[in-house]
From Swiss-Prot:
Signal peptide: none annotated. InterPro entries: SASP_SspP (IPR012614). The gene is sspP. The keyword Acyltransferase does not apply. It is found in: Spore core. Pfam families: SspP. This is Small, acid-soluble spore protein P. Residues 33-50 have a biased composition (Basic residues). Residues 1-50 are annotated as: Disordered. Belongs to the SspP family. The keyword GTP-binding does not apply. Induction: Expressed only in the forespore compartment of sporulating cells. It comes from Oceanobacillus iheyensis (strain DSM 14371 / CIP 107618 / JCM 11309 / KCTC 3954 / HTE831). Keywords: Sporulation. One of its GO terms (biological process) is asexual sporulation.
Length: 50
């Protein structure tokens, strides 16, 4: 067995990007209603799909 350099997946201390600090259970940004409104798109448009 020859000694090999550790690849990125086997590093002892991989340099991972740090996530923003947030208290447990707090959303990162925006409420559920806002997110739903943002992602609903054209579903609630009365003029869509005539």
């Amino acid at each position: 067995m020859s000694k090999r350099k550790m690849g990125p997946k086997q590093q002892k201390n991989p340099e991972l990007p740090k996530s923003p600090e947030q208290p447990y259970g707090e959303p990162l940004s925006g409420s559920k209603k806002e997110k739903k409104a943002n992602h609903s798109g054209q579903k609630h448009n009365p003029h869509h799909g005539l």
